[in-house]
Amino acid sequence: MDRLKLIKNLKNSMTKIFFFMSLLSANIYAKPNIILIFVDDLGYCDSEIYGCEEIKTPNIKKLADSGVSFSAGYVTSPVCSPSRASLLTGKYQQRFGHEFLPDAVPQKKAGLPIDQITIADKLQDLGYVTGLVGKWHLGTRDEYHPLNRGFDYFYGLLTEGSDYLDPTNPDARIIYRKWRGEYPPRINSSSELWSGRDSDSIFENKEKLVEERYLTDAFTSKATSFISEHKSEPFFLYLPYTAPHGPLQTTQYYYDKYKSVKNESQRIYAAMIDALDSGIGVIIDTLEQHDLINDTLIFLISDNGGGVADYGSNFPFRLGKHTLFEGGVRVPFVM
């Protein structure tokens, strides 16, 4: 696809989004619930959306089969935080100085500029209750906190990543890669794991927590609680799972599903995506139980291409995360 055609497609997509928002503002139609699932480092061929079958993702495929799957879905950046900044503001991140990962400068000073309006701000103004469950990665100072950026509720982490579970748990299946600076923490319990952290802790609103559950499962549980609590009012749920972003960590339950995969790292990576898909299935089931499935818009997008070093597959495209080749910015996209 040449540059002019790509720009035209992006313009058409933005026109449709703003038309939809204008309908909400005009109250022409009843306000649908909106769930935006923003997964982390999911490659183009890491699910069954586009015919790849190495990792079974029946729930993601169900979303695609019952809706629309985009074969040419692009994000504006091949890395986490800039892509998130663009998604939540509807602007190219370069226009407000957020084109780099905030980790490249002193972490506490970096974040989504406070003069930028988010989709959560807009939907709050339209009468939506707004929730964020998952990864923020747009600043750790109080002025950048999700509760100050349009969200009524927050559960998750403020930074780029976290352990998924206590590595001393006998149920944990973990690969530590020294070349990536990953080493087992010197701890004896979950409370030690979480209490020794700062911004990469798990928070509920602004309270630091000790989370005993596998993190993907915990995000799913909190998301379903949010849906159930607000089933009688229009809600916007931003659900940025951390999976399958590293570190490579899973539980025995998901690990056992991939006994045929001989490479240990690939096996854990597949299990992490399985947990993600299972969580999406629980979200769908919850909507069906509350008779909300036909009143809810569900979007599933990856923040960038799969990490090749983490066994992400962007087939048939070249390379992946951190690059501007197709594999880095052409992502799974379903609605």
Predicted regions mapped to residue ranges:
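Formylglycine-dependent sulfatase
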Residues: 28-335
